[in-house]
Amino acid sequence: MFIGDASILKPIQWCATEHPELPADIADWLMELGSMTRRFEQHCQRVHVEPQRECFITRDALGEEAEHLPVSQRYWLREIVLFGDNVPWLLGRTVIPEETLSGPDRALVDLGTLPLGRYLFSGDALTRDYIHVGRQDNLWARRSLLRLSGNPLLLTEVFLPASPLYTHCDSIPK
């Protein structure tokens, strides 16, 4: 697990969903409304997650993410690397206001190596407010404001070069 203040995610340049440089095959992945974990499972034998950082942080540590979440005394931060057949496919960062962590959803702080999608999409209490698309150098990224039983959480995903998102497109990152 990572100790310290640095995120595993480098800065991301966010753009409009209708960005003219967004190829249709990339948009199909980035605008996925279902579980990205399930989608990845269609392209490998085994998906697993390795947590890099799990801790409570203050609003000051959110940076521009604070614009997307309500004011809270603390936020649960989870940063992970998701692997498909032991190859890193995705960096994930989840920020959850403490108020979202009530009742059974308190389990979000104890996911460990369980992919977030397996928890979120196991019931019918999940909705998505929006998906923002962005770039981190040559890599595609997306950010979603999700609501679990009406309570918000912010999920940012960066698709690494070996990700199947790039398999059938002309913009494979170097």
Swiss-Prot record:
Subcellular location: Cytoplasm
Protein EC: 4.1.3.40
Binding site for substrate: M36, R78, L116, E157
Species of the source: Yersinia pestis
Main location: cytoplasm
UniProt KW keywords: Cytoplasm, Lyase, Pyruvate, Ubiquinone biosynthesis
Enzymatic reactions: chorismate = 4-hydroxybenzoate + pyruvate
Protein name: Chorismate pyruvate-lyase
UniProt pathway: Cofactor biosynthesis; ubiquinone biosynthesis
Described function: Removes the pyruvyl group from chorismate, with concomitant aromatization of the ring, to provide 4-hydroxybenzoate (4HB) for the ubiquinone pathway.
GO CC, alphabetical: cytosol
Pfam families: Chor_lyase
GO molecular function, one term: chorismate lyase activity
Gene designation: ubiC
Homology family: Belongs to the UbiC family.
Biological process terms in GO annotation: pyruvate biosynthetic process; ubiquinone biosynthetic process
Subunit structure comment from the entry: Monomer.
